[in-house]
Amino acid sequence: MAILAMVVFHFTFDLMYFGYIKAGTVFQPEWRMFERSIAISFLFLAGLSWQHTHRAGIKWLTVWRRVAVLGAAAVGISIVTYFTFGPYMIRFGILHLILMMSLLSLPLLSLHWAAPLACAVALGSYFIWADGPIQGSVWWMWFIWTNETAGSVDYRPIMPWGFAFFVGMGAHALMTHLNAFAYHGPERGWTRPFAFAGRHSLAIYLIHQPILFAGFNIYGFFVV
């Protein structure tokens, strides 16, 4: 559902970008809330799946593969958005954050479930003591929400957005502690499309916007 919500948001963003709906639509409070809920959902699921992957111990080959794939994808996203959006390019977006959180969370994978949840509280406390981005150097943009890059089309610094990743880790660790993952049967028919989307979420994230952009350009060329 998070993937579907992401596609819906980006489709609406593209409608605005190409001038088919009112400028500023996706910057309205309700759309900003929708967008942030999507980001939190993705980060929560990323943390949950990261904990699940390493539940029996850190799999270093998986770690380095993730670093390589996410690193390449994050750099690619930054380059593409630089040429597409200029000063609003993605400098530290959700892929950059997931990559960083995957590395920073390694010491917590084998700890008590309360450890990642405590880290989540520490990062999430930003929402309490700060009202939006703070005045800060661009060199700190990866760590804390600064106003230097607040206009980016996707900006997710560790504080506060990393809290959702830690919540996902803690939730999985707690559920494992409570032995809540008892079902290991086959996938039911209606769940298979969702399972497929979950397994290929990075690919969907990377290709859906180019497909939408191409579609809007073709429509504009032949129809409008």
Question: Predicted segment positions?
Answer:
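Alpha-helical transmembrane segments and their immediate juxtamembrane cytosolic regions
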Residues: 1-224
